[in-house]
Amino acid sequence: MKAVGLVTEYNPFHNGHIYHIQQAKAVTGADVVIAVMSGNFVQRGEPALFDKWTRTQAALANGVDLVIELPTFYAVQPSHLFAEGAIKLLTALGVEDVVFGSEHATVDFLNLAKQAPSVQGGKAFQEKNQTFAQAYATQLESETGFKLEDPNDILAFGYAKAILNLNSPIKLHAIQRVAAGYHDQSFTDDQTIASASSIRLALHKGKLEKVKGVVPNQTLVDISSANHTVDFESQFWPLLKYRLMTDTIGQLGQVYQMAEGLEHRLAAVALGEPGPQSYQSFIKAVKSKRYTFARIQRTLLYTLLNVKVDQMQAAMQDPYLRILGFTDKGQAYLNGAKKTTTLPLISKVDQHLAKANLRLDFKAGKLWQLLAREPGQQQDIARQPIHFTQAHTKEDK
């Protein structure tokens, strides 16, 4: 069977994702759709609106055949590491094609990536008032004429770089984003496709009726179930503030992505008087030209999870394929992939795995449970992959 890969967050799953799945199959002629999906935390360092099992269920109900978790050590990273992790997993599964949405679908991202090795030493990197990502984009534009600034284009460039770095045989296919831009914050009543961020914003404002036209039935069911959502703002900040108050500067400095004195700035703002009263006000107080919002949020998540640099480096050297769910077709493909993949396939997590290979995912799952006020809703231990059939859904035994 021929498989096409999708790199996803599904936060939440919406009609644009259905279009993506349909186009992926049409463009490649694939028999099986495999989604590599972020777990309980997404790339920007925020908790997903719904847990990974709820989002897996929605994906399987709407055309995906196999869902593999993108481990936290890849999922909560800058775009180039996020993309490399996803391509590494899809390559290990024997996926031939990856289809992605792009703001500029006619661009040859693989050719663009081939020109990139000469970029990093350019003049743009001497500018002190830019982030690394901004400097990189500026230098790339000066050498290639293409301005890399839209989120999906940045990820596409990351996929292309990863394919070159990993010597992967995967072929890339871009499809043009339709109806909604990545950062759109609103949508009209007659739209059938809206951005995930605009859907989250509408839900935050309590506008359930408004989102009915832009999400499938399964997502509506999930939205209606308060048991699956995260109360992020009110729950995250007290935990983080306590951590910043009690850790020493030396301890904070060991956290992954804590660099250039960021630990001093975080502690000073958190301990100031009267001090920020919310997570968002804290982020805004910390923000500077040197750090993007996403960079700060990722670092704060790793602070709360107490992830050290050496722990992250070790985890990234030991990837695995965590199976979250499959259809009958996905299960058949998986049975074949087991014979050829070089990465461990994990379908059930026990205490040993939770303390070893999956330690970071396990901790992230526990934190998500805490934020969602669902202490009994296990995210990893003893959870089985979802086996989706049209007749019924079950956790595979």
From Swiss-Prot:
GO cellular component terms, alphabetically, are: cytoplasm
Q: Where in the cell is it found?
A: Cytoplasm
Listed transmembrane segments:
none
Which catalytic reaction applies to this protein? cytidine(34) in elongator tRNA(Met) + acetate + ATP = N(4)-acetylcytidine(34) in elongator tRNA(Met) + AMP + diphosphate
Q: Does the keyword Metal-binding belong to this entry?
A: no
The principal location of this protein is cytoplasm
EC top class, in one word? ligase
Q: Which terms under GO biological process does the entry name?
A: tRNA modification
Q: Which UniProt keywords apply?
A: ATP-binding, Cytoplasm, Ligase, Nucleotide-binding, RNA-binding, tRNA processing, tRNA-binding
The cysteines covalently paired via disulfide bonds are none
Q: Where does ATP bind?
A: 7-20, 101, 152, 177
Q: Name one GO molecular function term.
A: ATP binding
The EC number of this protein is 6.3.4.-
Using the record for this protein, list the coiled-coil segments as residue ranges, or answer none. none
Family to which this protein belongs: Belongs to the TmcAL family.
UniProt function note = Catalyzes the formation of N(4)-acetylcytidine (ac(4)C) at the wobble position of elongator tRNA(Met), using acetate and ATP as substrates. First activates an acetate ion to form acetyladenylate (Ac-AMP) and then transfers the acetyl group to tRNA to form ac(4)C34.
Q: What is the name of this protein?
A: tRNA(Met) cytidine acetate ligase
Identify the species of origin.
Leuconostoc citreum (strain KM20)
